[in-house]
Amino acid sequence: MSTTPETADFTEWQQVVDLLRQAALEQKDDVMLKLLLTPDEREALLARVNILHELMNGQRSQRKISELLGVGVATITRGSNELKHQSDDTKEWLASLLKKQQQ
């Protein structure tokens, strides 16, 4: 008889975050993300980063961001709504992080 559990070993979002954190510590974050995400999903993630960047920048309308990035306005709106739920400290941290990565 097998003693293999009938449930998934990874059931919480925090476990995924911890897995990514450990991969980063081992300088294998790129490998892990490529294993977890298809090329299309990586492109979608890139679009999401650009959406956050454009929303934080505040110089373009959601419609213009949609046209620039080739994503639906609803996707931009979801990103905007998520940002609205974040603290000012989180928004400042994100703005700083995005600015550092741009350089």
Swiss-Prot record:
<dbReference type="GO" id="GO:0003700">
    <property type="term" value="F:DNA-binding transcription factor activity"/>
</dbReference>
<dbReference type="GO" id="GO:0005737">
    <property type="term" value="C:cytoplasm"/>
</dbReference>
<keyword id="KW-0805">Transcription regulation</keyword>
<keyword id="KW-0804">Transcription</keyword>
<keyword id="KW-0238">DNA-binding</keyword>
<dbReference type="InterPro" id="IPR038116">
    <property type="entry name" value="TrpR-like_sf"/>
</dbReference>
<dbReference type="InterPro" id="IPR010921">
    <property type="entry name" value="Trp_repressor/repl_initiator"/>
</dbReference>
<dbReference type="InterPro" id="IPR013335">
    <property type="entry name" value="Trp_repress_bac"/>
</dbReference>
<dbReference type="InterPro" id="IPR000831">
    <property type="entry name" value="Trp_repress"/>
</dbReference>
<comment type="subunit">
    <text>Homodimer.</text>
</comment>
<dbReference type="GO" id="GO:0045892">
    <property type="term" value="P:negative regulation of DNA-templated transcription"/>
</dbReference>
<dbReference type="Pfam" id="PF01371">
    <property type="entry name" value="Trp_repressor"/>
</dbReference>
<feature type="DNA-binding region">
    <location>
        <begin position="62"/>
        <end position="85"/>
    </location>
</feature>
<keyword id="KW-0963">Cytoplasm</keyword>
<protein>
    <recommendedName>
        <fullName>Trp operon repressor homolog</fullName>
    </recommendedName>
</protein>
<comment type="function">
    <text>This protein is an aporepressor. When complexed with L-tryptophan it binds the operator region of the trp operon and prevents the initiation of transcription.</text>
</comment>
<keyword id="KW-0678">Repressor</keyword>
<comment type="similarity">
    <text>Belongs to the TrpR family.</text>
</comment>
<dbReference type="GO" id="GO:0043565">
    <property type="term" value="F:sequence-specific DNA binding"/>
</dbReference>
